[in-house]
From Swiss-Prot:
Record domain VWFA: where: 179-354
Protein name: Collagen alpha-1(XX) chain
Signal peptide region: 1-22
Keyword Hydrolase annotated: no
Domain Laminin G-like: start-end pairs: 842-1037
Organism annotation: Homo sapiens (Human)
Bias (Pro residues): 1071-1082
PANTHER family (alphabetical): FIBRONECTIN TYPE-III DOMAIN-CONTAINING PROTEIN, TENASCIN
Keyword Glycoprotein included in the entry's annotation: yes
Length: 1284
């Protein structure tokens, strides 16, 4: 039909109705037909439109002034049924066709349900469409249309038009008491805001009902992953209490398990203990927004078969098919869906009316005739869970007083998972559960099944044992590249996972994994001489046991041992070693210089124990590596270092005068071979030009022409080698026989004062004009000075020197013919004197830091108090006094390498427990270089300094004698520093001695600090508090053995120590005894130089001293007069080697090289094909004879109860406090062998086992034998048909 105007459509409908009245009770027309079904439901059908429309929209709208909301539904078929309409109110019905371009009106009709039922043919009349008067329509009282069952589910949505409230509010008082349980979905998909709309909906549905103990009782359960009773039927007795409880209802959250919730309602809410009344009608209203994650069919069938009216309300994504499966018939009354939570409000009034009509339409006894009452049934007791393994549990219980037909055993993981069940015969009182997951807590329930229903169940929690790990891991065989591992199998394991990884990985080495079916594995491709961590884990499906590990070390390929060197020269060396015990194919020796510029390789037979390396470069360090090569690879490398000697110089030089002015120079060759040329240079002393000649390397003599008979010469010779090396030059002083210039002898140095040295010598024979003295600090850090001494004197004093400093002095005699050789000697100036008599050289640091009576007041953080024993006062250094001086202000000269640090100290209670430097020298950046540390926490003393290589050397003393320093009394401590050791004395008694490396040169610049904390850095760092009475550095390491510690009363000796000076004042004028010797005064200024004294008498000749160092070059003489031209020289020797020539032709190919080492392991191979299908399992045993069958209605009930797979799921045993945890269960395929892991090498490992026989899903075996026929008269249901 076209989408023409509504007036034409109404006219056609009016004409059709007028022509057909009186033919039958049901109004009919060619376009629209209405029929009234039981419970005042209205069924409508219309003619299907031509073309491809999108469906139909049906609108049932109350007439003006009605307070009810309109009803809109959509359908794909030309029929629909509407329920919940008021029989006495008028409605307007419109049917639209939905197309892609909009909607088009097909039919319109106004009706009243009572008029349609009561109108008769003689009172029928028509009225124009839109008149507003109700149209009388005969009632259709027969059965519903047989096509009704196939009608699509429709959705009720509220109209967007505003409604004007009118009429009284609806109230419902059923003729019989009613027990109403609301089952509300509280899953995460609803949300907090929508859950408030759900609570408003519940309040609107409950509001019309009269609530009381003898009227309507309301209970409510909220569910998600588990079900929770919010209140029972008998908990609240008034409507106000119920509505208040709805408002207080809190959102639960979780997953959607509707089947579990229905079983909870059956087992908990619909029980006499919860307020259920046997005479009351029972109604369950389900509100959900999604599809259940578990089975709902069984629990819903049990509820409906027990006479419970189930209404289902779905929102948004609710599964309509599932709602229809849950609800009681008729589905068009009990199933409702809305598209959004906002539309629940429009459905509330309609749902209240439908529930009320259902309660008014029949008593609670209208259910199935055979439906049993929900009475309490006997239950078993004393559930015992025993014989727990990793995959099985044994259950036993005390049977109920009345034996049930069967027991339903239901179990599932307590933290979520799919429940499983098994049925055992009634007489049994125990069973075993198999195929469980290891280390999993299970909730187990046992339900007795009687003819009248399901009794209360037993429940228990049990945790399966872990899968046992492998035991007794054993290394059956270990080779350099393989490990054979075995172990004892573990019960229940189907295969094993073996992991192998290096104990100390190198780079990106990965862990290797392999799965095996037998308790052994062969791991290959390993590296020799490495530790491997191997672990084995038992597996059963996806489960794994605790891993057991073992460490395996592959043996190394034996390397050579005891590497050594001999016959080391400047260009060759011999390396030797101890051979390996196993047969060696070849020994490879490689060497490379430390700079990497020179390398080489040589190979020796397998039985060789030495090899010669060469040619090498002189004065070069080589790294030598020796490796044994075996047929299976190379051993580890033995490494050593060798340094070649310096290129040797010619030796044993001698000069022989020849006739005329020629002289022959002879020498011993520098090396047997390798010398390319000798270069000889001679230079006359004083004035003259140097001459040079070259001699071939195979000669040992040379003639030097043109030497004057009255001139001395310096002759130098050096050797050049073929590898480019050059020896050190060797010099010889040649003096003709006609010239004699002897140097002075017996040169001696003595220290008169800290700033002067006395030099004396024995004059030589001959007329000496004067002596030339040159002196400078031996360290080379100071300036060089010279002085001339008259020839008549043989001694001189060198003034203005640094104290405690070594000086090198050279003296040469000046003759008329020139200068003699210089003789040298080394001497050291004395340290400053600590005593007036100069008997104790050293440095007084108390004076340097102004810790004296007349100067301490100007120092911040320092206080002075008289000594308890008289004599020297005591100075207290408070915390953070920060006493710091520059090195140059404290030590006018460097410290001698051998010295003694002396201090008299007392540690105070406020002295910190951490280490601090009583005295130390630092660099400019305050890095410690030298000092003494006291650690009150460890009760130890540490001395440290830097050696000549700037490395830190330290010695720590912590014996019992050292601990008393920290007990709060004064103690005198000597730290005697020698060249190779340091000794500690406490109260003049030796405590300990420690070896220590030689001290380097003390810093000339930097700082000296007192009490500085060891961790402190920078100029403003913290310092410790302590008392100090003495701090000296004595320029000797033997002073500790001479000191008598007279400052301490316990160490005083009356014979050697003077009496203490009393600090008390005496009234007597009698002078007392002389006081102790006072401290040395400050150095005075230098006096004016005195007049030169007379020469003293010549002393006796001294002992000949050691040969001195090479003298410094003499002063540059004045240019001489130009000489006459010389004679024509002799023909010179052969010149030096020329430049390198061009490269020669390529040589012949070398011999075939040795086989290289094994390459790295290749990449993993591709995954192998699936294994073959395992053998079919053995057939199960023949089933027992079935029991006598029951009547069909009772058998049907048993069948429904047995399918209640979720009876135990709704039990709230320990579930309210336990969050849901999904358990991943692997789907097993029959007899399929698992895929193997990819192999790492082509070599086959230990063969795997055949796959075990698969387990049929749901734990069923082979079908049992057909049960025998029951007794005549009643056909028995077989066991399989009853319980599947």
């Amino acid at each position: 039909m076209s989408s023409g105007d509504p007036a034409h459509l109404g006219l056609c409908l009016w004409l059709w109705l007028g022509a057909t009245l009186g033919r039958e009770q049901v109004q009919a027309s060619g376009l629209l037909r209405l029929a009234v079904l039981p419970e005042d439901r209205l069924q409508m059908k219309w003619r299907e439109s031509e073309g491809s429309g999108l469906g139909y929209l049906v609108q049932v709208k109350p007439m003006a002034g009605d307070s009810e909301q309109e009803v809109i539904l959509t359908t794909k078929t030309p029929k629909a049924t509407v329920g919940g309409l008021s029989p006495s109110k008028g409605y307007t019905l419109q049917i639209f066709e939905l197309t892609g371009s909009g909607r088009f009106l097909l039919a319109r009709r106004e009706f009243v349900i009572e008029d349609l039922k009561s109108s008769s043919l003689d009172r029928s009349s028509q009225r124009p469409l839109g008149s507003g008067a109700p149209e009388p329509t005969p009632s259709h009282t027969g059965s519903p249309d047989p096509e009704q069952a196939s009608e699509p589910q429709v959705a009720f949505t509220p109209s967007q038009d505003p409604r004007t409230p009118a009429g009284p509010q609806f109230r419902c008082l059923p003729p019989v008491p009613a027990d109403m349980v609301f089952l509300v979905d509280g899953s995460w998909s609803i949300g907090h805001s929508h859950f408030q709309q759900v609570k408003d909906f519940l309040a609107s549905v409950i509001a019309p009902f009269e609530i009381g103990p003898d009227k309507v009782q309301v209970g409510l359960t909220q569910y998600s992953g588990d079900a929770q009773t919010e209140w029972d039927l008998n908990s609240l007795s008034t409507k106000e209490q119920v509505l208040a409880a709805v408002r207080r209802l809190r959102y639960k959250g979780g997953n959607t398990f509707t089947g579990l919730a229905l079983t909870h309602v059956l087992g908990q809410n619909l029980q006499p203990a919860a307020g259920l009344r046997p005479e009351a009608a029972k109604v369950v209203i389900l509100v959900t927004d999604g599809k259940s994650q578990d089975d709902v069919h069984t629990a819903a069938r049990v509820l409906k078969d027990l006479g419970v009216n189930v209404f289902a309300v779905g929102v948004k994504n609710a599964d309509e098919a599932e709602l229809r499966l849950l609800a009681s018939p008729p589905r068009d009354i009990t199933v409702h869906s809305v598209l959004d939570f906002l539309q629940l409000g429009a459905l509330a009034g309609l749902l209240s009316r439908l529930i009320c009509q259902r309660l008014q339409g029949g008593s609670p006894r209208q259910g199935p005739a055979a439906a049993p009452a929900l009475d309490t049934l006997p239950a078993p007791t004393s559930l015992v869970l025993s014989q727990v393994t990793s995959s099985s549990i044994r259950l036993s219980w005390t049977p109920a007083p009345r034996h049930p037909l069967k027991y339903l055993i239901v179990w599932r993981a307590s933290r979520g998972g799919t429940p499983r069940e098994v049925v055992v015969e009634g007489p049994a009182a125990s069973t075993e559960l198999h195929n469980l997951a290891s280390r999993t807590e299970y909730l187990v329930s046992v339900f007795p099944i009687y003819e009248g229903g399901v009794g209360e169940g037993l429940r228990g929690l049990v945790t399966t044992a872990p899968l046992p790990p492998p035991r007794a891991l054993t290394l059956a065989a270990v080779t350099p590249r393989t490990v054979h591992l075995t172990w004892q199998p573990s019960a229940g394991a189907t295969h094993y996972l073996v992991r192998c990884s290096p104990a100390s990985p190198k780079g990106e080495e990965e862990e290797r994994e392999v799965q095996v079916g037998r308790p052994e594995v062969l791991l290959d491709g390993l590296e020799p001489g490495r530790d491997y961590e191997v672990s084995v884990q038992s597996l059963r499906g996806p489960e794994g046991s605790e891993a057991r590990g073992i460490r395996a070390r592959t043996p190394t390929l034996a390397p050579p041992r005891h590497l050594g060197f001999s016959d080391v020269s400047h260009d060759a060396a011999r390396v030797f070693w101890e051979g390996a015990p196993r047969p060696v194919r070849l020994v490879r020796v490689t060497y490379v210089s430390s700079e990497g510029g020179h390398s080489g390789q040589t190979e020796a037979p397998g039985n060789a124990t030495s090899a010669t390396l060469g040619p090498l470069s002189s004065s070069t360090t080589y790294t030598v590596r020796v490796t044994c090569l075996y047929p299976g690879g190379g051993s580890s490398t033995l490494t050593g270092r060798v340094t070649t000697k310096k290129a040797p110089s010619p030796s044993q030089l001698s000069m022989t005068e020849l006739p005329g002015d020629a002289v022959q120079l002879a020498w011993v060759a520098a090396a047997p071979s390798g010398v390319l040329v000798y270069q000889i240079t001679w230079t006359p002393l004083g004035e003259g030009k140097a001459h040079e000649i070259s001699v071939p390397g195979n000669l040992g003599t040379a003639v030097l022409p043109g030497l004057g008979r009255h001139t001395e010469y310096d002759v130098t010779i050096l050797a050049y080698y073929r590898d480019g090396a050059r020896s050190d030059p060797v010099s010889l002083r040649y003096t003709p026989s006609t010239v004699s210039r002897s140097p002075p002898s017996n040169l001696a140095l003595a220290s008169e004062t800290p700033d002067s040295l006395q030099v004396s010598w024995t004059p030589p024979l001959g007329r000496v004009l004067h002596y030339w003295l040159t002196y400078a600090p031996a360290s080379g850090l100071g300036p060089e000075k010279s002085v001339s001494v008259p020839g008549a004197r043989s001694h001189v004093t060198l003034p203005d020197l640094q104290a405690a400093t070594k000086y090198r002095v050279l003296v040469s005699a000046i003759y008329a013919a020139g200068r003699s050789e210089a003789v040298s000697a080394t001497g050291q100036t004395a340290c400053p004197a600590l005593r007036p008599d100069g008997s104790l050289p050293g440095f007084d640091l108390m004076v340097a830091f102004s810790l004296v009576e007349k100067a301490y007041a100007s120092i911040r953080g320092v206080a002075m108090e008289p000594s308890a024993f008289g004599g020297t006062p005591t100075f207290t250094l408070f915390k953070d006094a920060q006493l710091t001086r520059r090195v140059s202000d404290v030590y006018p000269a460097p410290l001698p390498p051998e010295h003694t640090i002396v201090f008299l100290v007392r540690l105070l209670p406020e002295t910190p427990r951490e280490a601090f430097a009583l005295w130390q020298m630092t660099a400019e950046d305050f890095q410690p270089l030298l000092g003494v540390l006291l650690d009150a926490g460890k009760k130890s003393l540490t001395y440290f300094h830097r050696d000549p290589r700037a490395a830190l050397q330290e010695a720590t003393f912590d014996p019992q004698e050292v601990r008393k320093i920290f007990f709060g009394s004064f103690h005198k401590v000597h730290v005697a520093v020698g060249r190779s050791k340091v000794r500690l004395y406490v109260d003049c008694r030796k405590v300990a001695e420690r070896p220590l490396g030689e001290m380097g040169s003390p810093p000339a610049a930097g700082f000296v600090t007192l009490g500085r904390l060891a961790k402190a850095r920078g100029p403003r760092s913290s310092s410790a508090a302590f008392q100090l009475q003495m701090l000296q550095i004595v320029c000797s390491d033997t002073w500790a053995d001479e000191d008598r510690c007279c400052e301490l009363p316990a160490s005083r000796d009356g014979e050697t120590c003077p009496a203490f000076v009393s600090a008390c004042s005496c009234s007597s004028e009698t002078p007392g005894p002389p006081g102790p010797q006072g401290p040395p005064g400050l150095p005075g200024r230098n006096g004016t130089p005195g007049e030169q004294g007379f020469p003293g008498p010549r002393g006796p000749p001294g002992v000949k001293g050691e040969k001195g160092d090479h003298g410094l070059p003499g002063l540059q003489g004045h240019p001489g007069h130009q000489g006459i031209p010389g004679r024509v020289g002799l023909q010179g020797p052969k010149g030096m080697r020329g430049l390198e020539g061009t490269a020669g032709l390529p040589g012949p190919p070398g011999p075939r090289g040795f086989q290289g080492m094994a390459g790295a392991r290749g990449t993993s191979g591709e995954r192998g094909p699936p294994g073959t299908v395992g053998p079919t399992g053995l057939p199960g045993p023949k089933g027992e004879r079935g029991e006598k069958g029951e009547p069909q209605s009772l058998a049907t009930l048993y069948q429904l109860v047995s399918q209640a797979s979720h009876v135990s799921k709704f039990d709230s045993f320990h579930e309210n406090t336990r969050p849901p945890m999904p358990i991943l269960e692997q789907k097993l395929e029959p007899g399929t062998e698992p895929l193997g892991s990819p192999g790492t090498r082509s070599k086959a490992l230990v063969p795997g086992e055949w796959g075990r026989g698969g387990r049929h899903l749901e734990g069923r075996g082979e079908p049992g034998a057909v049960g025998q026929m029951g007794s005549p008269g009643q056909q028995g249901a077989s066991t399989q048909g009853l319980w599947e």
